[in-house]
């Protein structure tokens, strides 16, 4: 008799990277969505503008969960206009304490002209060191590449693109269908 697995299929994927350099902040992400060993979609858009366009964000994890969190963050940004850190902390509090939100499986990187933040389901709100942060299955590869490139003459967008290409070379859950959003930074 063969053993069968009744475990739910595991969604894999994505690499999201942010780089803050030279008066710009850039968030980029790949477009691959996989379930198990199968690519379901190659051109998903996991990076977008939020609020009134003064915040950009990217997500890794379950798509429906991420959109729920983006909506919640936009609501917090309406409550605390121009205060991304405060809005993110308030979202993180809700995420940790709300029974429904606690079940959501996603991570987010968000940025405005002043700050870049990573938000996790455990209530962490982290600001990256040296203006570089990555999440997702290829995040460590993209992060290493971006840190290696940050002190070169490349601009923020070039660093994000090259680093995501490197991650796609290594991580089977990351592809080269890259979406970029950028803002002027202080």
Swiss-Prot record:
EC numbers: 3.4.25.2
Entry keyword annotation includes Metal-binding: yes
Any one biological process term the GO annotation gives: proteolysis involved in protein catabolic process
Coiled coil: none
Single GO term (MF): metal ion binding
Subcellular location: Cytoplasm
GO CC terms of this entry: HslUV protease complex; proteasome core complex
UniProt keyword Protease, yes or no: yes
Binding sites annotated in the UniProt record for Na(+): 168, 171, 174
Reaction(s) this enzyme catalyzes, per UniProt: ATP-dependent cleavage of peptide bonds with broad specificity
Catalytic machinery residues: 14
Family matches, as InterPro entries: ATP-dep_Prtase_HsIV_su, Ntn_hydrolases_N, Proteasome_sua/b, Proteasome_suB-type
Activity regulation (record text): Allosterically activated by HslU binding.
Keywords for this protein: Allosteric enzyme, Cytoplasm, Hydrolase, Metal-binding, Protease, Sodium, Threonine protease
Domain of life: Bacteria
UniProt record similarity statement: Belongs to the peptidase T1B family. HslV subfamily.
Function summary: Protease subunit of a proteasome-like degradation complex believed to be a general protein degrading machinery.
Entry-linked HAMAP family: HslV
Subunit and partners: A double ring-shaped homohexamer of HslV is capped on each side by a ring-shaped HslU homohexamer. The assembly of the HslU/HslV complex is dependent on binding of ATP.
Protein name, entry field: ATP-dependent protease subunit HslV
Primary gene name: hslV
């Amino acid at each position: 008799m063969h053993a069968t697995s009744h475990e739910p299929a595991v969604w894999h994927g994505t690499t999201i990277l942010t780089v803050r350099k030279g008066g710009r902040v850039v968030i980029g992400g790949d477009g691959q969505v996989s379930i198990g060993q199968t690519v379901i979609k190659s051109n998903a858009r996991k990076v977008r503008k939020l609020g009134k366009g003064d915040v950009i964000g990217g997500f890794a994890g379950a798509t429906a969960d991420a959109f729920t969190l983006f909506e919640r963050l936009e609501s917090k940004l309406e409550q605390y206009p121009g205060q991304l850190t405060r809005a993110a902390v308030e979202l993180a509090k809700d995420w940790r304490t709300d029974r429904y939100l606690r079940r959501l499986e996603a991570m987010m990187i968000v940025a405005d002209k002043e700050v870049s933040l990573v938000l996790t389901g455990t209530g962490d709100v982290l600001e990256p060191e040296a203006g570089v942060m990555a999440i997702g299955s290829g995040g460590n590869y993209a992060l290493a590449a971006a840190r290696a490139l940050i002190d070169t003459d490349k601009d923020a967008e070039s660093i994000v693109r090259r680093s995501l290409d490197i991650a796609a070379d290594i991580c089977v859950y990351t592809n080269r269908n890259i979406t970029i959003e950028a803002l002027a930074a202080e």
